[in-house]
Amino acid sequence: MSWFGFFDPDFDDFFGRPRKYATEVPPNFNPRKIAQGDNGKGQQVSRYGAGAGHPHRALARRDDFFDDFWKNFSSGKYFVGFDDNVKTTEESDKYVVSYDQENLSPDEVNVDFDKQENELIITVTQETEKDGTKKSSTFHSNLKFEKPVNFDDISAEIGEQGVQVTLPKVHADHEKIVNIPISKAAAKK
């Protein structure tokens, strides 16, 4: 049995999912449970049961996943799970990423793009006050792309439902295929 045979790559791209990091240790934090969920009691539980398959494309991203996990952990960012607020749609000429969280203000959100890693980083910083005590929380959601992005033309908009980021591809998918015309050979004499 493979270490990574617990998911089906057609339905759950484990290593390619957007990850969420916090700058403070969450309650009941257990870094050993990388695939986590919430059982309604504030406790982390595994979302994945046993399964079959050995997805090769996921293995290609496996090393990046663990490298990012430890790189961020060493810099004071704690992996708190996969960010289900981030939704990605791939079109032939662009990626559209939406971060669904209501009532965000532009000063709470920062959108960065790492050109070297081809990675979008959405940072949300929120401050709350309760009983005279102020608390600041920062979450980082990271999303890597397989195809190169034209980073000079990236745009982001914020609305009532959250943030929408448009990332144009360097080459549209249909531009990768070139049609070669076929001519009829001249008849030999």
UniProtKB/Swiss-Prot annotation:
Gene Ontology biological-process entries: cellular heat acclimation; cellular response to oxidative stress; filamentous growth of a population of unicellular organisms
Keywords: Stress response, Virulence
Pfam family, one: HSP20
Keyword Membrane: no
Superkingdom, natural source: Eukaryota
PROSITE patterns: SHSP
Gene Ontology CC terms, in alphabetical order: cell surface
Classification via InterPro entries: A-crystallin/Hsp20_dom, HSP20-like_chaperone
Induction annotation: Only expressed in stationary phase. Expression is increased in the absence of adenylyl cyclase and in biofilms.
Domain sHSP: 77-183
CDD domains noted in UniProt: ACD_sHsps_p23-like
Disulphide connectivity of cysteines: none
Region (Disordered): 26-53
Family statement: Belongs to the small heat shock protein (HSP20) family.
Function: Heat shock protein required for pathogenicity. Mediates thermotolerance and adaptation to oxidative stress and ethanol-induced stress. Required for invasive growth and filament formation under various filament inducing conditions. Plays a role in the capacity of damaging human-derived endothelial and oral epithelial cells during infection. Potentiates resistance to antifungal drugs, as well as resistance to killing by human neutrophils. Plays a major role in trehalose homeostasis in response to elevated temperatures.
Protein's name in the database: Small heat shock protein 21
Lineage of the organism: Eukaryota, Fungi, Dikarya, Ascomycota, Saccharomycotina
Gene: HSP21
